[in-house]
Amino acid sequence: MAENEKVTYGGALPPSPSTADTEVAALARSMTNASRSSVYSPEKPDGTNPFLGTDDPRMDPLSGKFEPERWTKAILQLQSSDPEGYPHHTAAVSFSDLSVYGYGRPTDHQKTVGNYFLDIPGLARDILGRKGQRIDILRNFEGVIRESEMLVVLGRPGSGCTTLLKTIAGETHGFWITDNSHINYQGISFKRMHKQFRGEVIYNAENDVHFPNMTVGQTLRFAAEARTPRTRLPGVSRSQWAEHMKDVVMSIFGLTHTVNTKVGNDFVRGVSGGERKRVSIAEVALSGSPLQCWDNSTRGLDSATALEFVKSLRLSSKYAGATAVVAIYQASQAIYDLFDKVVVLYEGQQIYFGRADRAKQFFIDMGFECPPRQTTADFLTSLTNPGECLPRPGFEGRVPRTADEFAAAWRNSRDRQELLQEIERFNDEFPEDGEHLEKFKKARKLIQAKGSQSPYTLSTPMQIRLCLKRAWQRFMADTSNFLTSVIGNFILALIISSIFYNLPQNTLSFYSRGALLFFAILMNAFASSLEILQIYEQRPIVEKHKRMALYHPYADAIASVLCDLPGKVIASFAFNLVLYFMTNLRRTPGAFFTFYLFSLMCILVMSMIFRTIGATSKTISQAMAPSSVILLALVIFTGFTIPTRDMLGWSRWINYINPIGYAFESIMVNEFDGREYACGDFIPTGPGYTDVPATSRVCASAGAVFGSDVVEGAAYIATAYEYFPQHKWRNLGILFGFIAFFACTYLFATEFIAASKSKGEVLVFRRGHVPLKKEGASEDEEAGTGSTGTRTQEEPVDKDANIAGIQRQVATFHWEDVIYDIKIKGQPRRILDHVDGWVRPGTLTALMGASGAGKTTLLDTLANRVTMGVVEGKMQVDGHDRDSSFQRNTGYVQQQDLHLQTSTVREAMLFSARLRQPHTVPDAEKAAYVEEVIHLLEMQKYADAIVGVPGEGLNVEQRKRLTIGVELVAKPQLLLFLDEPTSGLDSQTAWSICTLLRKLANNGQAILCTIHQPSAMLFQSFDRLLLLQRGGQTVYFGDIGENSRTIIDYFEGQGADPCPHSANPAEWMLSVIGAAPGAVAKRDYYEAWRGSEAYRAVKEELRQMRENPKPISQESTDALRVYAAPFHVQLFHVTFRFYQQLYRTPSYIYSKIFLVAGSNLLIGFSFFNAHNTIQGLQNQMYSVFMGLTVFGNLVNQIMPHFVTQRSLYEVRERPSRAYSWVVFMLSNVLGELPWNTLAGVVLFFCWYYPVGMYRNAEVTHAVTERGGLMFLLIWQFMLFTSTFAHMLIAGVDSDVTGGNIASLLFSLTFLFCGVLAGPSGPNAFPRFWIFMYRLSPFTYLVEAMVSVGVANAPAFCSDIEVRHFEPPSGETCGQYLQQYMSVNDGSLANPNATADCQFCQQTTTNSFLTGIHSSYAHRWRNFGFLWVFILFNIGMAVFFYWLARVPKGSRVKKQK
């Protein structure tokens, strides 16, 4: 490789020029002079190039003995031989007077169907640039982080941590930096850094977005290749560099074993959540950016892995000069001690910036006390919670309390003066646009490929090649979509071809040939419609990689198009080959390949259009409704349903810009031009007309000439469609033009239009319930309530709230010898092994253990929530077995905070109280109890706030409190289970949740709570502990004791090493039993427990409870019911809640209304006031037919809502026995009813009157009856659509799968409804398919709507529909046709003429109805049939849900 003479450490770990330089120089000298005999000494690498292979296992990342520090020193030694050839670049940063602000409201009102349009003035203000109220997010920040330094950012959620990191990284979407703010990246200005050198300063969010079907190795290899430098170590190719760097980061982050495992996501099985987090970290590490901002990147990692992550940053800083800024919400002392500097944030203000080892003493000197065993990070963060910080004795009234007071104290401190001096020295050393900028540019230039433009490392062709390779890997990893597409297209082609099988070579096939080619071109055109969804799936990943400067988004777009091309060719060939030859289209090679060429061109044009729609819209819901109307317009104005001649003047332009129209014209010309078709039907014909001269009859087809037995194909398409042979190849050029235009718009949109970003969090209230004066904290993006322009301080936690009214529990729940076995891959596996314990009222019991020890499984088993496996053992309440009401009488707070997004806090709790408290309790009493719980949980300020989604609604802590509240208001009579209530929370929020649990326990609640590695202070909140080791084996059950003394004494008595005074007893205890990563137990503590005195005391206590049961109170049968509320009460509340949810989701309702209104207004005005000519009546039929096409979009709107409802029900509400599954299914159907009725009304007025069918009713004096029946039929169509959607999705996991099934079934019902082909006549499909014609609900709907719309009205012919012929000599036209007209409908314009007879084939619309197998007499029969279909859908929806998703009895085998 020519560009391979030299190499820098490049994107990976460039050497540092400051303190590390001296170290490296000395290191290099000592290594160079070292003797060969010492090559394996840990301090002295041997000078070999690890990229080219090495015998030293400590330098080989795949050896299992890899030492990153030794490897790093070896690279630096090699590079030190040519400092000019391997220049490095660093990006330290200083900032002063840094203030950040946004615009918005601290609270917002909830949008509903009723108030949606009241926000139009606000929208107008936004458009005019009036941004609303200014909100200060960060105020007057100052700091400096030099190269090789690490800064930890501490603060509660909402304090501004995320905003500070984003500001440093230049990701300022949604907020603004004040003009007087100054940021200096070591001599590079803020603007220049983020324009020219994007990717050198990067921000890593806590979300993990990757392509789920790619393996970990492929994902990281891609990142390594994208940042491979041009100058590398001698002899190292690009491929070797990328492969070795991938291996190195995988070894550092413990991912080597996952190299061939898919990354996965919530829907695709792959690596674990913690491993996925490490993949994200490794990907950023490979970018080698000199300044890295990490936002809560340790969330989801255990403490050992989090420590390894921070150690890897330390290594990068020490030897590469990298600068790291890290926000961590729960930092152990070991993690904190790795940082050089710390900044503490309090409500958007800086209250400390300086050395990490001085911060604690700074605040102690200020007058605060750090409790024993509290980590420094927790101590610093606790200062920002007035209810938690502790003044030292004598300092109670002198320490700062509010954010403003803390900020003032910091500004007046000596530490701050020293910081200002340091910033000044830094800025003097690195003036903007000075010497360091030139060094930085030079280093970047050496790294970049030749021809690459900053800020990307690779040139554009190299980026495209790399993205193409990745696209192929993604395709090979998941070929299911491709194979489904090919097989599905093949089967659909067989079905369509069988309907039009072997068309005759006469004029009777004209309509069928046109319909077949129309359907074929539409199937080709819409084959790429799912590409919109694909764009949204990969968009977050592409945008992330753009921020990391890995590649241009348009490079990925080009690669995606190229990779999809072979698949499109194969899938379309499978479809078109079968369809073309089975149906007897023109059988010549040239004709087939011309047909295929235009079909393929249509696919490519529409692919570009779909991609453009996806790339230009910011959200998927934004894309759906408008694109549906646009696509419908393309279908209507193709030229088949409305020939170009009949298109109304206002809409003719749509055909001119319609690529499908040009493709359709060319394949019609290809089929008909240059061919003659024998006439299949003459006028007149029949008895008495067999021997008439040729000039006295004419073929009943457009383009016919009297006197001829054949019709020229070119004449037919010219007359019927105004299509001309000379346009065929012209249209190909036009299609190429469309492809080029939409390819450009697609590439432009991918490069410049970003997906919508979330706002900073604000509370959302119902309109009329917004607090008049909202006081809150910061509007930082990671959490928190919204803020106003002025900040007021948060109230301290009320630790003594009145809780007297809360339900007290009196029963003790106890379990003995609980065993749980399941089969994994056919092999039995024990998850729980003889677990004993109890929970008494008024106690808080912690359930702890190693990851995989069975904590959640034990909770599920005790709560009677496991659905498979074998459970053994005794689980009793006061000595009695659990009854059918057990699940209803226990509260279970799950780890996931699942709530209905549109409910308010109060409504969510009322719903739980009404359905889970006994039915005999008056509603007023339930409401009063809810208010008590709201007060207890300190939720008064946001009781009327909408739950919402993260970003717009409750924050993490508020959601957790609501989850607990929903269970409390159910008045659980037995106990409360909690699964990881502090998981993912910052330390202060975790503390407030544990304080709340303590408060509940003090009030008599019995609580069993799993908790993962709590801090020493959190651990002390609990009374008792049940500790499990791997395999579900108990190693301790008993009291914790004051300062954990009891449990420490127990384990020390069993031979454990003494617990250090400063250690966290919870972490010490886990390491003792070998549950902490890397720890090994000295003995089997399960056996030690079984042989201990404490174990015998537990067994004795359990025996006493078992043998002395408390007397059972004489409960009513109501108390033992599975559900507290009767069926009708459940149905009322659940249906009302679902109706309310839809009312509060205006985007769903209005997109439904817009879809229905837009589509049908388009149809109505496209077929405006259709006349009762032959073509006009066809147009009226097509207006019904086209109206059915909204079916698919309506179904796809309903399904995702159902899946959301179902996940909430199945995960939280069904296990707690709130209401039955039948109620759930019926409420979903009934809740849609009002909105479907409204949509039906809109559809009726937007379609019925513009098309002009009411005029046919006027003639028959049945305006009211026919108009009313038409509305009822439309209403039935809406109900059928809704119930059909519920039937399909009821038993299916994914709305995507349900949508695919719906599309297939819709295509079949659409094909067999009798419009494109019928059961008899010239357009008849084979008799085999007659059953589909009778099964299709659209058969009856179309027949009823068309007959009600056009029956019993007079009809006539347009000029081109009149057939001309000569009567026999001596006869008038009337005499000649008298016999023919006696048995056939028709009229003569000139019955007395003796030449040029002008005959129209219809006088009444009923003859048209007869031709399409419709009858007005069947209208009420069809109306009844449609109700049968609707009721069948409802019944099958309930049945499928029961069959697929309702546990049948219980699959759990219970053994005593």
UniProtKB/Swiss-Prot annotation:
Residues 118-372, 813-1056 form the ABC transporter domain. The gene is eriD. The keyword Mitochondrion does not apply. This is ABC-type transporter eriD. The chain crosses the membrane at residues 481-501, 515-535, 561-581, 590-610, 623-643, 734-754, 1148-1168, 1184-1204, 1233-1253, 1269-1289, 1301-1321, 1337-1357, 1423-1443. Residues 30-40 have a biased composition (Polar residues). InterPro entries: AAA+_ATPase (IPR003593), ABC2_TM (IPR013525), ABC_trans_N (IPR029481), ABC_transporter-like_ATP-bd (IPR003439), ABC_transporter-like_CS (IPR017871), ABCG_dom (IPR043926), ABCG_PDR_1 (IPR034001), ABCG_PDR_2 (IPR034003). Its main location: membrane. SMART domains: AAA (SM00382). It comes from Hericium erinaceus. GO terms for cellular component: membrane. The keyword Transmembrane applies.
